[in-house]
């Protein structure tokens, strides 16, 4: 199992727009083969207010490639991305693939 970690730098004044994007993306992500572990938003009481994180599991690298292709072709995803870009809620995105450490 590998996890796609999507690290977002967001405009804290556009948090509502980002939340709408995340809610709208849950369906396309699942439909494309991603298992959503969760989206995590900044808090008002600790840490930076402009960072968010999405964690999505896929079984292996081949499944990740299939997921990325299916998501890129999804018409709802395309609309969501266009709406997000228009809102300027996300300033930067960084994607990394990580694996869970499992103690033996």
Describe these PLM feature segments.
Residues 2-9, 40-72:
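Short, well-ordered beta-strand segments in beta-rich or mixed alpha/beta enzyme
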Residues 10-18:
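Short, surface-exposed ligand-recognition loops at beta-strand->loop->(often short) alpha-helix junctions
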Residues 20-38, 57-95:
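An amphipathic, aromatic/His-enriched active-site/gating alpha helix that lines ligand/cofactor pockets
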Residues 99-103:
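Specificity-determining recognition surfaces
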């Amino acid at each position: 199992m590998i996890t796609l970690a999507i690290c977002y730098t967001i405009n804290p004044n556009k948090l509502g727009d980002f939340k709408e994007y995340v809610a709208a993306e849950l369906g396309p992500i699942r439909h494309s083969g991603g298992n959503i572990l969760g989206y995590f938003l900044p808090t008002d009481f600790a840490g930076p207010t402009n960072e968010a994180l999405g964690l999505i599991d896929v079984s292996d690298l081949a499944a990740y490639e299939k997921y990325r292709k299916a998501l890129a072709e999804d018409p709802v995803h395309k609309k969501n991305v266009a709406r997000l870009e228009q809102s300027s809620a996300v300033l930067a995105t960084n994607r990394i693939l990580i694996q869970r450490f499992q103690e033996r």
